[in-house]
A protein has these predicted regions:
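Beta-strand-rich domains and repeat architectures in extracellular enzymes and scaffolds
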Residues: 60-94
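Short coil/turn segments at the loop-to-beta-strand junctions that recur within blades
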Residues: 68, 110-118, 156-162, 201-206, ...
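Asp-box/WD-like beta-propeller blade repeats and closely related beta-sheet repeat scaffolds
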Residues: 121, 136-183, 197-206
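Blade/loop signatures of beta-propeller domains
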Residues: 31-65
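Conserved blade-ending motifs and adjacent loop-strand segments that build the rim/top face
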Residues: 244-264, 309-339
Length: 381
């Protein structure tokens, strides 16, 4: 099964090739603050692990049905809104396929190209005023499409960060590996001009992100970064706090990685380490969810993934490998709905493998298809 972690692993193996092109100024400069929780997790401690039937009340299997040219890659990102699934293939096909809540195909946004109404890449997708807004860093613009995939308008911006989130009074940008300014986060006005800088940095290291770092939450903005164990919060007054911090023991990214003046040496050291990669973070009124991948330096086949779920201040963890009964959860979590269902994008076989061990959680479904499936994992109260 191709999972999102596959893309992450490919990046890690090729990180040295990116050094000369993609450099980011990064450092660890968090102020001392004891008001946040530090969550410790040892993935090798069996007492820390939880069974799926303790986490989920049921699973809902939704086959994605579409025309022959709609080929769903399970590495794609997913947005769920207003009873629609938006499957975002930003890596391979550079398109967005839209399905209803039953998995029936609605339309596609496939404007990849170089004309005035086409984007070269998909770096972020937002749903704004019933339109789909596609941000392309290369084009320095947002492209708006309606639900039928028809182009509506183009919105150029002055400065183009790697990741972009449009808000009421402007934009948030993630500078990432651009290395153009000494900050990881910028606030921009409605024209895309930088007006504020956040999370100042001082060292040069290579870094990239597989999914958006931005998580809007109750009027604040949360920031998740792949190789950092802190989730930062920028509140409505512009102050930066640590929202929550994770301690993975020996899998924590070495501090020397952020302090090394030589980006090649830093990347080499990272590839020689067993590390935790914070892939996704979700939060709603009742739950926090962290998807974290663990890379093994000496054995790529030994890599594994863990899903952390917090409810009523208690964290539970589910560890999964890329084979076996729990392979369906191997770095495949895409989103958390407001009704507290985790969205997983999977092929049929991992679901069948899971069903053999946990038949009470999985309903009967038609698996004689080449299509991918949306799996809604309903969290227990």
């Amino acid at each position: 099964m191709l999972g999102l972690f596959t893309g992450t692993m490919i990046f890690m193996k090729n990180i040295l090739l990116f050094v000369t092109l993609l450099l980011i100024t990064v450092a660890c400069n968090k102020k001392e603050d004891t008001s946040y929780n530090i969550v410790k997790y040892n993935p090798n401690d069996k007492s820390c692990q939880t069974s799926p039937d303790e986490l989920f009340s049921s699973l809902e299997i939704i086959p994605l049905e579409g025309p022959e040219d709609v080929i769903i890659d399970t590495e794609s990102n997913v947005i769920y809104d207003n009873n629609r699934f938006y499957i975002i293939d930003a890596i391979r096909r550079k398109r967005i396929d839209i399905f209803n809540a039953q998995g029936q195909y609605i339309s596609s946004i496939k404007a990849f190209g170089r004309s005035g109404n086409e984007y070269i890449g998909i770096d972020h997708v937002q749903l704004l005023d019933s339109l789909v807004a596609v941000y392309s860093c290369h084009n320095k613009a947002l492209y708006y499409f309606d639900i039928n995939g028809t182009f509506v308008k183009k919105e150029p911006i002055q400065y183009a960060p790697l990741d972009l989130l449009k808000v009421r009074d402007g934009y948030w940008g993630y500078v990432g590996n651009a290395g153009e300014i000494p900050a990881r986060i910028v606030k921009m006005d409605m024209k895309g001009k930088i007006i504020e800088k956040y999370l100042p940095v001082s060292k040069i290291i290579p870094l990239t992100e597989e999914s958006s770092v931005f998580i809007p939450y109750k009027g604040d903005l949360l920031i998740r970064e792949t190789l950092r164990s802190d989730i930062f919060k920028i509140d409505s007054t512009g102050n930066v706090h640590t929202f929550i911090s994770f301690d993975f023991g020996r899998y924590n990214v070495p501090r020397s990685y952020f302090e090394n003046n030589d980006p090649v040496a830093a990347a080499t050291k990272l590839m020689q380490s067993d590390i935790a990669i914070m892939d996704r973070f979700f939060v709603n009124d009742d739950y926090m969810v962290l998807s974290v991948d663990f890379q093994m330096a000496d054995d790529s086949d030994a890599a594994f993934s863990s899903l952390g779920i917090c409810h009523r201040d208690k964290w539970k963890w589910l560890r999964s490998e890329h084979r076996g009964a729990l392979s369906m959860f191997y770095s495949t979590t895409k989103a958390l709905t407001q009704k507290s269902a985790l969205i997983i994008l999977s092929e049929a076989q991992p679901i069948l493998d899971f069903k053999k061990v946990y038949p009470e959680l999985v309903p009967e479904f038609n698996h004689n298809t080449d299509n991918s499936f949306i799996v809604l994992c309903h969290l227990k109260e």
